[in-house]
Curated annotation (Swiss-Prot):
GO terms for cellular component: host cell endoplasmic reticulum lumen; T=13 icosahedral viral capsid; viral outer capsid. Ca(2+) 2 binds at Q177, D228, V229, D231, D301. Belongs to the rotavirus VP7 family. This is Outer capsid glycoprotein VP7. Gene3D superfamilies: Glycoprotein VP7, domain 1 (3.40.50.11130), Rotavirus outer-layer protein VP7, domain 2 (2.60.120.800). Calcium-binding protein that interacts with rotavirus cell receptors once the initial attachment by VP4 has been achieved. Rotavirus attachment and entry into the host cell probably involves multiple sequential contacts between the outer capsid proteins VP4 and VP7, and the cell receptors. Following entry into the host cell, low intracellular or intravesicular Ca(2+) concentration probably causes the calcium-stabilized VP7 trimers to dissociate from the virion. This step is probably necessary for the membrane-disrupting entry step and the release of VP4, which is locked onto the virion by VP7. It comes from Rotavirus A (strain RVA/Human/Japan/YO/1977/G3P1A[8]) (RV-A).
Amino acid sequence: MYGIEYTTVLTFLISVILLNYVLKSLTRIMDFIIYRFLLIIVILSPFLNAQNYGINLPITGSMDTPYTNPTREEVFLTSTLCLYYPTEAATEINDNSWEDTLSQLFLTKGWPTGSIYFKAYTNIASFSVDPQLYCDYNLVLMKYDATLQLDMSELADLLLNEWLCNPMDITLYYYQQTDEANKWISMGSSCTIKVCPLNTQTLGIGCLTTDTNTFEEVATADKLVITDVVDGVNHKLNVTTNTCTIRNCKKLGPRENVAVIQVGGSDILDITADPTTAPQTERMMRVNWKKWWQVFYTIVDYVNQIVQAMSKRSRSLNSAAFYYRV
């Protein structure tokens, strides 16, 4: 009986040894095949011309220059473009079919006629009260007016950035701004904003909390106001609430599907002086003021370059959504 058990054990050990030998032999054979294959590739590679799917960059020149891959999908074939312009443009052109004409011209740049939308606004002030940006890409034309420089800058800051806003109850509470990204934004037919900074005892600094006439006036009868005060200091506010709504807002970052185009003017609007605003000159540009036909021709010519500086976004903007989450 013991002899049978020894035979079984011996047979098992011999099987294990044979299996181990076979596996090692297979491993050596595979190594030989792989190394031989790699050697052949190394020898033949100088004589082969493989397809390079990268983008060729020049050895010399500025590496800051953007090189676009021409094989990428053309975004305008599946996107919508809104063009916002002042009503005076249509008045000067005086042609009932001018929008159809421009649509046909946009078609030559690859934009289907059904993807272009023209939106008129009366003036900067009225547009700032009720901005509506619904397209995948939005181009806002603003004619330069020396008397409205601040209004234009604030509107550009509003449109080119995303804001998270909450209501303010200025009758019950004091408010303070926590950092540079924190602003108070007011909208309405007439916004007059007065502030009174408070010390740690909630006493006015240079003003009386019980007398609004002693408050500092930071805006008078404006339709759009972006108020910036000293951070970390409580303020008592006085606002014309019957004609204006004020919100406590936080700047989240750039709204990359919007570009502002200044039409004419010797001075160029720039909102990048705000330390919370990243440089965005590519989405804020100027065209020379001639005639409105000339302005629109210029936009058609450069529309694709302008869109390349933008990003398609699905989030829309209107005055109601802006107050809470943009």
